[in-house]
Amino acid sequence: LLFSTFKGSGYDIACCDVNHPIIYNKMGNSICINKANFNPPFIENLFLIYLGKKQNTQTSIENYSKSQFNKVESIKKINRICDEFLKCNDLIHFEELIQEHESIISKAISINPIQKSTFIGYKDGKIKSLGSWGGDFILVTTKNKDLTYFRNRGLNTIIPLKEMVYLG
């Protein structure tokens, strides 16, 4: 029903049915869901920050569908990055992966990465857009766990990632 009406990936629905991190792959109308182990040694340096700018998911999907880019090559790169995310034991490398992922998605949807457009002054780590890019939450890395930069911008809902996700 989802694929024929909303055209979404189904990822959010898949997440509702599990109590652990997953790797989600969609090829046409086929989906593959695998359990993922994600509990890096730098988990204390990862935070979710609520932006309160819910995006229209349907509009985002329509814009993505119209975009012109090498989808096959981009998917290969993103799959490699995802594999590296799961194996990553170093915050600096994790941040490099975030930047690479943001760059690929930015080109695909013709939107600047949020760190370059909205949070250009943030220098203590990297920022990863989540969901429909620029909506409800961002993932933030920080080397010294000081998130004053975001609080000074009125973003006070800051949740340590380890409190929000099941790390099992």
Regions found by a protein language model. Give the residues of each.
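C-terminal nucleotide
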Residues: 2-7, 11-132, 139-168
